[in-house]
C-alpha cells in the first residue's frame, strides 16, 4: 500500500507539472504574450534558479553528517542573519533576471546591448519590485519622537535624518574609489584568465601566499610592546562594524554545481586555483571560494535604479551597522536582538547559558536547537561529530577562543550594569534598564577603541593627522564602513595572530592542566572554554603573552595559511589567499591607486618600492609575481609597508584606518561625547573606565595591568583590581520633581515602556513584545492632572491568519502560539535550516523504476494530447517578440509546425510559490524555497 501511495503521488505530481505549463502556453499563443508577462516569466525563472540552488544547499547541509570541512565552516561563519539573507536573495534574483534579459535582448537584436535599452521604465520598476529589491533601496521612515533621539535604533537607520541609510545594517559598503571590474559592472579582477593588467595577468593568490606571505609556525617574532589582547580587540571590533555575507547559495545558479566541487568560475563560485606542484595528494585543483552577495540595485541591476543611463557597478553589503555600537553584544536586527534578550527578567538582562556556569559567572547561551550545528562537539560524547555554537550579537563568536572570551566578557558586563542600574532606579522598566545598560556598553566600546586601541595602531602622528580631537557631530560625515577598510585595511590584524592559544594559571604561568593549543585545534570549539578552565585562563593568556609582531618576511603563519578552520584531515583553507581573492571579488583598485588617494607618492620602479618595503627580498618577490607595481593587491601592499613611528601599520593603512575611524566618530549622532547622549557627570564617569576594569568586574582575576593592551611581566607590571578606577553609576540615578503628580507608571503584560522628555514634560513610550500588537495609545504624557491616557494593552497576533504573507512555507503547517507561531511538518519530513520549510529528512521511500516508467508513460501520453489540442487552437498563433532558450537550462520547448511557443520550466508551479515574496518586512517568510512535498 505504501508503494502504491508513493506511485499515486508521483503520477499526480507528474501530470500536474506537465498539464498546466501546456495550458498556460496555449493561452499565451491564443491571445499573445504581453511585455509584462515576459518580464514576469523571466523573474519566475530567475527565482527558480536561485531558490533551487539555495534549496540544494539546504538539502546538502541537512544530509551532511560528520565533522564539517574548512570550506563548510567558512560558509557557516559567513552565514547571513535572516534579514540579510532576504536582501541577498533578492539581489541575486535581480542579478539573475537582468542577465537572462541580457541574453534575450542580445539574441533578438543580434547585437550586445543592455536590457534597459529595450524595456520601459515601468517594466524596470516591475522587475525591481517583484524581485524584492526595491524596498531596500528606499529610505526608511524615521520616527520623530523623543525616544528616537534617546536610544540608537538597533539597525542603525535614521542616525542621520538627512541620510537615513548612512551606517545602517544591510546597506552597501561605501566606495572611496570606483571599483575595477573586468566587465565594468560585476566580474572580479582575475575572473577571465586572458585579462591583462599593464600587460600582465594577475598572479594566482595562492602563489602570492606561498612565495610572499606564509611562514612556518616556528618562525614567530613576539611584539615587545603589546599584548595578545590588542590583536583580539581589533578582531572583535572589526566584527562590530563589518560583516559581508557570502552568497546565500553554495551552488551555481546556472546549473546547481556545488561550489565546493567545481574549479570553474560560475557565479557565485570564484575558486582559488592551486598550482600543480602545490596540490594535495588527492589532486584537488582549487580551494572553494564564494563571492560576496551583491547589494540590491548594483552590478547588472544598477541601471534599474536612479539614472538609467548611469552605470552602477556591483557593490557589497554590510550586514551589520557601521557604527561602534556594541552590535557584537546586541545584534544589528530586531529579530536577533529579541533572541539575545532575557524576557523573563525585570532587570533588562541578556540571555545566558541555562545550565553551565564559570565559578558562578555566566557563559554565552547556545544557538537554538533548530539552528545548524557547526561547532566541535563536547568531548567524550560517543558518536557526536558536531555541537552547537554560541549565540551572540555576531555569528562569528565561536570562531576562535579569543573572540569567544571577549563576547563572554561583555555579556557579563551588560548584565552587571543592568542589575546595578535597576538597583539604583527601581521604577525603571525592564526595557529602560536594558536600553540604558546597552547605551553604557556601547560608549565603553567607543572609548576603548578610539582612546586606547587606534592610537597604538596608527601611531601618535598619524592619529593626530587623520583622526584628531573630537569637535562635535558632523552631519556631512558619512559613517558607512568603506569597502577598502573592511576588505583590506582592517585585515592587517590577521598578520598579528599568534599560532598558539595560551592559557595561564593564577600565577600567570603555563597552566599545568591546560597546555597551549595550536590555533587549528581551537577553531569553532566552545568546549575549549567550557571544559578548559573557563574564561580566566584565556584572559590571563591574552593579558600576559605578547601579540605576534607583523614582520615583512613573517606575515602569516601556517595555522592560518594551511590549517584555517581545520577540524579534520579532509581539506584546508588559506586565510591570506581568501583575503586577496576577496579584494578581487570586490573590485578593489590596486595598491598605487590607494596610495594616490591618501596623498602618498606612487611607486613606479623597484627602487620606489624599496622605499616603502625595507626588506629587499620581499619587495623583489612581490614584483616578480605582479610584474608591475600598479597590479599589486592593496591588502598585500599595505600589509608589507614599513611601520610608521610607534605604530603597527604603514602609511597607507594608517591613512585608510584613520579616515574610517574619524567618519565613524564624527558621523555618529549617538557618539558618547555628543552633548545630548549623556550628562556631563555621566561622561566624566565613563572616561574613568577601562578594559582592565571590565576584566576585574567580570572574571576571577584580582591583578591586571593598568593598561590591558600593554604587555608586561607578572607580578611587577600588574596592579590589584582595587586600584583600577572605574565609573560610579550614581550619575545614572533618576529623580523626579517633588511636584510631579504622575508617579510611577503601570506595567503592561507582554509589553514595556521607557521614559523620555519632550518639551520639558515626562513622556512614556510603550511597546509590545514580538508577536503582540499594541491596542491603545503608544505615548502617554504627564500633565498637571496626571497621565493623559490609560496605559495600552498588548494583544497576541495570530501570524498564521496572515494569508498575504504566511509565516510558514506552503510545505509546512502553521500553528499559532502565544507571542509567536510554529511551522510543523508531517512525518517523514522535517524543518530545514530556515525553520519554515519542510524538506526531505532522508527517510522517504524511494520511487521504484516501475513507478517511474508508469509516470513517464502517463506524462508522455497526456502531454501529447494536450500539445495536439493547443496546436490546433493556435494554427494562426502570434509570434513571440522575444526569442526562447534564455536560460540555458535545457527547458523543453513546444513546437507546432512553424510556430514556436515560449517554453515553460517544469518547476513553474514551484516558482509560483515564490510570486508573493516578502519585501523584507519584519515577520515575513524569509526563505521562500521550492516545495519539498
Curated annotation (Swiss-Prot):
Pathways involved = Hormone biosynthesis; thyroid hormone biosynthesis
Signal sequence: where?
Answer: 1-18
Which residue ranges run through the membrane?
Answer: 847-871
Output one GO MF annotation: heme binding
Q: Which intervals lie on the Extracellular side per UniProt?
A: 19-846
Q: Which UniProt keywords apply?
A: Calcium, Congenital hypothyroidism, Disease variant, Disulfide bond, EGF-like domain, Glycoprotein, Heme, Hydrogen peroxide, Iron, Membrane, Metal-binding, Oxidoreductase, Peroxidase, Signal, Sushi, Thyroid hormones biosynthesis, Transmembrane, Transmembrane helix
As for membrane topology, the entry says: Single-pass type I membrane protein
Q: Name one GO biological process term.
A: hormone biosynthetic process
Judging by the UniProt lineage, the source's domain of life is Eukaryota
Q: Which positions fall inside the EGF-like domain?
A: 796-839
Write down how the cofactor binds this protein: Binds 1 Ca(2+) ion per heterodimer. Binds 1 heme b (iron(II)-protoporphyrin IX) group covalently per heterodimer.
Q: Which residues are catalytic? A: 239 (proton acceptor)
- Region annotation Disordered: residue ranges? 881-933
Q: Where does heme b bind?
A: 238, 399, 494
Q: What is the effect of changing residue 665 to W?
A: In TDH2A; fails to localize to the plasma membrane
Q: Which Gene3D superfamilies match?
A: Complement Module, domain 1 (2.10.70.10), Haem peroxidase domain superfamily, animal type (1.10.640.10), Laminin (2.10.25.10)
The consequence of residue 771 to R is:
In TDH2A; fails to localize to the plasma membrane
Which residue ranges does the entry give as Cytoplasmic-facing topology?
872-933
Q: Catalyzes what?
A: 2 iodide + H2O2 + 2 H(+) = diiodine + 2 H2O; [thyroglobulin]-L-tyrosine + iodide + H2O2 + H(+) = [thyroglobulin]-3-iodo-L-tyrosine + 2 H2O; [thyroglobulin]-3-iodo-L-tyrosine + iodide + H2O2 + H(+) = [thyroglobulin]-3,5-diiodo-L-tyrosine + 2 H2O; 2 [thyroglobulin]-3,5-diiodo-L-tyrosine + H2O2 = [thyroglobulin]-L-thyroxine + [thyroglobulin]-dehydroalanine + 2 H2O
> Bias category Basic and acidic residues: which stretches?
922-933
Q: Which residues are glycosylated?
A: 129, 307, 342, 569
According to the UniProt record, one GO cellular component term is: extracellular space
Concerning its family, UniProt says: Belongs to the peroxidase family. XPO subfamily.
Q: Related disease?
A: An alternative splicing in the thyroperoxidase mRNA can cause Graves' disease. Thyroid dyshormonogenesis 2A: A disorder due to defective conversion of accumulated iodide to organically bound iodine. The iodide organification defect can be partial or complete.
Q: What does this protein do?
A: Iodination and coupling of the hormonogenic tyrosines in thyroglobulin to yield the thyroid hormones T(3) and T(4).
UniProt protein name: Thyroid peroxidase
Tell me which species this is from.
Homo sapiens (Human)
